[in-house]
Design a protein with these regions (language model features):
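Short hydrophobic segments within beta-strands
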Residues: 46-48, 146, 182
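Short, flexible loop segments at boundaries between secondary-structure elements
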Residues: 75, 79, 166-193
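Short acidic (Asp/Glu) patches
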Residues: 24-32, 83-93, 122-131, 161-168
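Short catalytic/ligand-binding loop motif for oxyanion handling, primarily in non-cytosolic enzymes
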Residues: 54-57, 114-115, 151-155, 188-191
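Active-site and ligand/interface coordination hotspots across diverse enzymes
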Residues: 1-76, 161-175, 200-216
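Short, surface-exposed acidic-centric catalytic microdomains
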Residues: 56-122
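Residues at the C-termini of beta-strands that transition into short coil/loop
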Residues: 109, 183-186, 205
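Internal catalytic-core helix/loop-beta-alpha segment
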Residues: 100-159
Length: 216
């Protein structure tokens, strides 16, 4: 059974007029998706978004806005059992599938905005520090941060490039936890496609042990 809050809209899509109400200072706009150790579930891959969009906050589901390529690319990579439509909320069956596979989802910053570039540099930096503080307890095998620009700001790594990072370059990053940066899957990112994102997810899933090298 999920411990996450149900969609504030009761399983329907938000209207355009409703979205503005979710642009609040609250730092817990959306609940994390995390495997439950009490159920014997192990966190292998922790996917970290930048921050929730307004649609995502409206339905309490990660990457929920239609047109976001996160869920289609995750499925194409073989990381979900079926295509996921989170536009009205995350189906408990899909959440359970992620947890069984050892996949968790969180954000650098919990405040919902219409666009990620509305966040301040200090919000991103504090979000980066907060993630580092959480890692000793969460203990994922691999962390994948979705967004190179936010990563550069959060961790003062202006020359960082997409792909596998050097964790030792991040102050306080726990030993033994791999770190990757993948492209932002938003439809606003013209440099990424569902296919290219799927390739990125396969790479990080192999690092985390979610997929095996001979997986299709």
């Amino acid at each position: 059974m999920s411990t996450r809050r149900p969609s504030p809209l009761g399983g329907r899509r938000p209207t355009r007029a409703e979205l503005a109400a979710f642009a609040t200072p609250a730092t817990d706009a959306i609940d994390d998706v995390l495997p439950d150790a009490a159920r014997g579930e192990e966190l292998r891959l922790l996917i970290v978004g930048i921050n929730p969009g307004l649609w995502t906050a409206a339905v309490n589901a990660p990457f929920a806005r239609p047109g976001n390529r996160f869920w289609p690319s995750l499925h194409r990579a073989g990381l979900t059992a079926r295509p996921v439509d989170a536009s009205t909320g995350l189906d408990p069956e899909d959440e359970a599938d992620l947890r069984r596979r050892g996949i968790g989802i969180t954000n650098l910053v919990g405040r919902a905005t219409a666009r990620a570039d509305e966040l301040t540099r200090e919000e991103l930096r504090e979000g980066g520090r907060a993630l580092v503080r959480r890692l000793p307890e969460l203990r994922p095998r691999t962390v994948a941060i979705a967004g190179i620009t936010a990563f550069r700001t959060a961790y003062s790594q202006p020359r960082a490039r997409l792909g596998r990072q050097v964790p030792a370059a991040i102050d306080g990053w726990p030993a033994g936890i791999a770190l990757h940066v993948v492209p932002q899957p938003s439809g606003l990112n013209a440099h990424a496609t569902v296919d290219s994102l799927a390739d990125d997810w396969r790479e990080v899933a192999l690092s985390a042990g979610v997929l095996r090298a001979n997986s299709d």
